[in-house]
Amino acid sequence: MLLEFADLDNWVKKRGSILFKKFKYEPFTLEEADKALKEEGIEAENTKELLSILRRKEIIIAKKDPKDKRKRLYQFVKSAKKPTKDNLIRNLKYCADLIRTSVDYKVLLVFLFYKAISDKYLALVEKFVSEGYSKTQAYLMANRSYLTLYDEDEGKLYVWHEIVKSRETIMELANALNKIANLNDNLKDLSKLVEVLGLIGFINEDNMHILEELVRVYNEMDFSEIDYDAIGDAYQWILSYFAPQKCKEGEVYTPVEVVRLIVNLLDIEKDSEVLDPACGSGTMLIESYRYVKDNYGGEIYLYGQERNEIMAILAKLNLILHGVDSEEYEIYIGDSLKNPKIWRGEVDYTIANPPWNLDGYNEDVLKENPDVRRIYNTFVRGGYPPKQSADWAWVQLMLYFARKKVGIVLDSGALFRGGKEKKIRKEIVEKDLIEAIILLPEKLFYNVTAPGIVMILNKNKPEERKGKILFINASLEFEKHPEVRRLNRLGEENIDKIVDVYENWEDIEGFSRVVDLEEIRKNDYNLNVSLYVFPVEEKEDIDLRKELEEFKEIEKKEKEVLDEVIGYVEGILRAGS
């Protein structure tokens, strides 16, 4: 653990070492950390900041206390003899800068996927061989327990290390990926990605040296002992690194901090089913999976639907790299608003950041299919959105499929626009389905500077929350983005503050307020957060007596200086006379 503390500020290093010495790998609370520091004669006023820094550096993890969900348990992460995530990211950044505009960024994702599954597969093979099985037996056992990378009929192994030996490396990589797609039912779409990327088409004098350098760098990365979260984080890093550029081209990328906020607000329970009807590259589903595993240790089943075929394939690769078993997820390709692939009551939670203000989904489009028509008439009779924005169509769709809760990111305009959207909004409010609305800070998203909102809807509101909506104005809850200067991001302290207020269901001046539906009716169903809670400017407490004493002291010093100057000038005048 000493190595993990090496690059930290001295005050963090000292206090972190005390906590590690005290707790080792046992869980502990904030209060217990305070006590441990005080026992060593250290004031504990910044313990929360200390734990936040250790979390950011991934030295500790935090999860909910099963005895009291309002509290958190902290635990040091066991070190392993393996490359660090930072090393991975450093190598990937080099690769990203190398390809920049010459090669599609998805090549990095595909190479990462192929190299990682190959290393994991061969590690399994080694394990089976060490237990006394033959190489062929080990290949077949690894096929059954992980992914099929050995073709039994051909007697050929399709792993990265074998393929890159060829003089026609890129051609062989493309062929191997197509073969793996044929050998694995859950990867059959991989061939489409290879086709779209046109790997073989990259084989020309301009690009060949780039691709050869990529292969060299990936050869040096060993994923066999790296945990799935670190590999998955590397995959997510590639997506986020290229997000500013790809968002300009129409792709949607949700910052992982916003996703974590929603997952924490939903407090997804074990043995749950979760649906993201606009799943993109799968971040919402993966964070839901992580949340359940970290906090409850149970099973979770994930459904995703995405109309962009390539993004749907990337979501599948993302899930595999995060260690999600193929039996624990299903990703569908298609338009969720017009052709949802699963039907009512099949999931516990729905979660999404759908495209904001998506146009072209008015009544004429949504009533064509009788089954789909039912969705937009369940909560609101004739609840079809205007042609220019499908925001409230997404809300109805997600409510339709959820047994328990919905967490959705929307454009803030959805809270107060009139016309058909107001009609839908009114009915959703009157049915008491909205539990909380959080106004996010501006400049969180790559493709828009305007602030978004998070809406939590609950079909099973506790008695004390019925007839009320919690409004949280988190517009000032951000830190500057460490990599993209023009952006902000939600820090862990910001997320914790929002979640704590939601769980405690409390009023805090300038930050949160519980509002009765009657007040919302009086405001004509306008749900604009700033209408109900507005940040309070910090008032400076002025101690007049202290200020007066300081003023007198300044005046006294000024007089002393003035007297000194006058004396100096008079001395000069006397000397000259």
UniProtKB/Swiss-Prot annotation:
It holds the Pfam family N6_Mtase. Gene3D superfamilies: 1.20.1260.30, Vaccinia Virus protein VP39. One of its GO terms (biological process) is DNA restriction-modification system. GO terms for molecular function: DNA binding; N-methyltransferase activity. S-adenosyl-L-methionine binds at residues 251-256, 281-283, 306, 335-336. It comes from the Archaea. The keyword S-adenosyl-L-methionine applies. It catalyses: a 2'-deoxyadenosine in DNA + S-adenosyl-L-methionine = an N(6)-methyl-2'-deoxyadenosine in DNA + S-adenosyl-L-homocysteine + H(+). Keywords: DNA-binding, Methyltransferase, Restriction system, S-adenosyl-L-methionine, Transferase. The keyword Ligase does not apply. Its EC number is 2.1.1.72. Belongs to the N4/N6-methyltransferase family. The type I restriction/modification system is composed of three polypeptides R, M and S. The subtype gamma methyltransferase (M) subunit of a type I restriction enzyme. In the presence of the R subunit the complex can also act as an endonuclease, binding to the same target sequence but cutting the DNA some distance from this site. Whether the DNA is cut or modified depends on the methylation state of the target sequence. When the target site is unmodified, the DNA is cut. Type I restriction and modification enzymes are complex, multifunctional systems which require ATP, S-adenosyl methionine and Mg(2+) as cofactors and, in addition to their endonucleolytic and methylase activities, are potent DNA-dependent ATPases. This is Type I restriction enzyme MjaVII methylase subunit. It comes from Methanocaldococcus jannaschii (strain ATCC 43067 / DSM 2661 / JAL-1 / JCM 10045 / NBRC 100440).
